Amino acid sequence: MIKYCIFSIFCFLPFLIWADELPQLGKAPLEKVIQAMTVDEKIRLLTGTGEVAEDILVAVGETDKIVPGAAGTTYPIPRLGIPAMVMADGPAGLRISARRDSCPRTFYCTAFPVATLLASTWNTDLVQQVGQAMGNEVLEYGCDILLAPALNIHRNPLCGRNFEYYSEDPFLTGKIAVAMVKGIQQN
């Protein structure tokens, strides 16, 4: 009887060990990682760390430690190997803080022309070059997500964010937006 018990333990031990292993991002298929996420984790991944809850107040303050001045981070899920991703604002170039507490150097980003001015050139090659330069800065400063370009059209001249949009013409907006995204994604 003892032999059968020992044999059973050794046969099923690997299954017990592997049953507790969680899929890790980058090592397991993405579908498995998503299946292992709780509904709360999925919601937090989509909403980021701007939400106020007791257990994530620490994560909200981490953005400035990663990239000072960045717009925010996504909620990290360490048990599945999902890191916090840094989001940076940038319809006219990457916007982050120029100063770091830990470094005496100043970190300037390029201030590119606003979207309406870029679109007025009708030059998709130029816009793609601007996008590539933005993408380079995003990469160099350690940001993961650029919250740009803004893909909207000018519907009302009183809209306070029209400077972020390319044009009132949907055709021009589409052509320029494609060029910008291609440029950013070259990195």
Model-derived features: positions:
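N-terminal beta-rich core of secreted/periplasmic extracellular enzymes
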Residues: 20-187
